[in-house]
Amino acid sequence: MSSDPHRKLHVVFFPFMAYGHMIPTLDMAKLFSSRGAKSTILTTPLNSKIFQKPIERFKNLNPSFEIDIQIFDFPCVDLGLPEGCENVDFFTSNNNDDRQYLTLKFFKSTRFFKDQLEKLLETTRPDCLIADMFFPWATEAAEKFNVPRLVFHGTGYFSLCSEYCIRVHNPQNIVASRYEPFVIPDLPGNIVITQEQIADRDEESEMGKFMIEVKESDVKSSGVIVNSFYELEPDYADFYKSVVLKRAWHIGPLSVYNRGFEEKAERGKKASINEVECLKWLDSKKPDSVIYISFGSVACFKNEQLFEIAAGLETSGANFIWVVRKNIGIEKEEWLPEGFEERVKGKGMIIRGWAPQVLILDHQATCGFVTHCGWNSLLEGVAAGLPMVTWPVAAEQFYNEKLVTQVLRTGVSVGAKKNVRTTGDFISREKVVKAVREVLVGEEADERRERAKKLAEMAKAAVEGGSSFNDLNSFIEEFTS
């Protein structure tokens, strides 16, 4: 690396092909570019469309900033995948029988990128590579050319620390049943969880072996970039840096860097609703009167569960915006009670598909967030200062729920008991009503709201000269020198 203090840091970003990974990576690349670095995002032909328009707008507004896209080939059919399968959205937008097979096949097929990555690193010699956790082979590729590889997990310190402590101590093996609560050993805060809420850890399965590769790659890497801010999870940031992996930089919340209407509206897919009309609808509501319900880009609930949510929302009497993911192959909408939309007209809005989430969360009419506890959604809710109803489904989402309900105390659990990949643990309408009312009404609700608003202030301060701003400075200085 050059010691020239005036040269630009060149960072290559390589996100996993899922919206929950690509959206924060785009935010991160824009952030680095705005701080004087040159950013290069690696992706596939179909996924490049997600990045192109936001990057063009960003460059038009900031002509001196350097950010571009490099497209890698991903021959789906040759790799044993269906034509056009370049994003997890391809096989998670339905509940078909081969979903599990396709998931594993997709993860393993990404190794095809290794040769292309090595050629790029050899010819461009960037200062560092920030590659997704699901690309464990990226560490070895970067080592060949003495390029530091940083890992981006797309989650926070709390879940990383929780998973580490459970992996090291295996406390789930000494309880009487999968539903018996236990305290996660060594983790600050006496956090209680059950075996049913932990993602399947069968290390002999093909996916289990793949995840072992991921963990080994983490340890060999040059460190971790975390989309979080110190004030959100200080005990866990300290624990991670002292016990789990010594080198980590927190630079979030990344969503906060999107300040303009277009920036917020263009994150991810094209919204399934006109953003201006959506905001007009919210403008017609009183401040703090609308609850927003969304389960992210992967969770895919069955009709029976959607029916219960609809019935619960109607009974709660709350104004709402409810985002329902479109399922491929399901033409008839059998998930709505008869006459539901007519009865809630004016009080409720259903968005079928993709929503301009940050725009909705940031609106003054929005007063709460029913969320699957995916890390991006959780952080966006935190940045908007909203109390939450937590409804985790899979992956590390139950850990994230514990952060909200047990540590931050800004949320109420809907009562999900099982980590069930993508379809969700069945929750009755009565539980939906109870959780929504609990997060909106009463003295405890007011206290949760106050705590949530303080966290939003801390999030803003962190990126505007605070902890995240300073950690990014430290990172840039270290990898430029």
From Swiss-Prot:
Positions that bind UDP-alpha-D-glucose: 355, 357, 372, 375-377, 380, 396-397
Upon deletion of the gene, what happens? Decreased resistance to avirulent strains of P.syringae.
Q: What are the transmembrane regions?
A: none
The residues forming a coiled coil are: none
Which branch of life, at top level?
A: Eukaryota
The task this protein performs is described as: Possesses quercetin 3-O-glucosyltransferase activity in vitro. Also active in vitro on benzoates and benzoate derivatives. Involved in stress or defense responses.
What is the designated name of this protein?
UDP-glycosyltransferase 73B3
